[in-house]
């Protein structure tokens, strides 16, 4: 996956997480679990970006 695609994926995950966070703030407890899930996905994608950037930098 390209760096741009990974960044778009993070953006999409953040938008979904924000929507779920609004539901959680309104009292929907199960939305909190979904927020945590999306944040974990974002963390993983961010790590992939870091790895890809480091790999590209080392091969320059």
Where does each model-flagged region fall?
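Short, surface-exposed loop/turn segments at secondary-structure junctions
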Residues: 25-33, 60
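N-terminal acidic leader/helix
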Residues: 1-20
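A structural signal for well-ordered alpha-helices, especially hydrophobic packing surfaces
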Residues: 14, 18-21, 39, 43-46, ...
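Short, charged, amphipathic alpha-helical segments
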Residues: 32-40
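Membrane-interface helix-loop junctions in multi-pass transporters/channels
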Residues: 4, 53-59
């Amino acid at each position: 996956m390209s760096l741009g695609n990974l960044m778009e994926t993070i953006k999409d995950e953040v938008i979904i997480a924000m929507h779920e966070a609004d539901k959680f703030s309104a009292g929907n407890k199960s939305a909190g679990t979904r927020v945590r899930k999306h944040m974990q996905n974002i963390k993983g994608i961010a790590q992939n970006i870091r790895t890809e950037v480091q790999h590209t930098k080392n091969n320059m």
